């Protein structure tokens, strides 16, 4: 018996089509807030289970509405919002960020050109890690962490190195563990305060200890302070930039949590400290903004 090709010379062999896989750079990237756990929860919801989702800070679904003043301002400004803004974001909003921090005693001075607006803090985290990290650079990140920091570091070619926040010490960072994990490849340290997910609010003593380590090893400080106005039981928030005005510090914040508008994606990042030591980094930010 002859094969099909001999019987029908007009028939061509089946072409093997290209398969599109995810990029290799994603192999070490995980983001469980939107990964398998979230997918399992959605599947259980479809099966009729009532799932209480604690994975994302999303106050709107629990009936916490945005303040009326924000809603009114958005509606009033819609007719004037069709055009592109400057690459760093609209000037009135950046000016408002400067004014906000001028009201905080001890916060180092910065100006409107040091402020970047983003599609939430998440976009700004990715922008900063892309501008800062070369392949193999290490970033110290708290454990447990907000997983975007680990994912963004990996996606940018860096290596996340996790330092311990000890549950038996009220979830405070272990300064000893941080010191043990600094090496010649360490480029930055992430400080999430108030912390997500633990809720810990760090004392001045802890923050000064972290600043001392960053100062000794000339690390950039990446201060995630999105929950700075969500405080309980008399807790007081202290900014990293306040205790480390001599260090290059990127402070991240936004409207999402304090003003219950996470869906509006309104975040900012500003740089404080000796910016002359970060001119190339700033040029990278301006390129990506």
Please place each PLM-identified region on the residue numbering.
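Short acidic capping loops at alpha-helix termini that bridge into adjacent secondary structure
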Residues: 109-115, 135-138, 185, 246-249
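Active-site phosphate-binding strand-loop segment of PLP-dependent enzymes
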Residues: 161, 166-236
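Conserved PLP-anchoring active-site segment centered on the Schiff-base-forming lysine
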Residues: 131-153
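N-terminal small-domain helix-loop-helix segment of the aminotransferase-like
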Residues: 4, 8-120, 127
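Helix C-cap/helix->beta junction micro-motif
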Residues: 47, 156, 216-217, 247
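Conserved core segment of the aminotransferase class I/II
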Residues: 4, 11-12, 242-289
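A short helix-loop-beta submotif of the ANL/AMP-binding
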Residues: 155-161
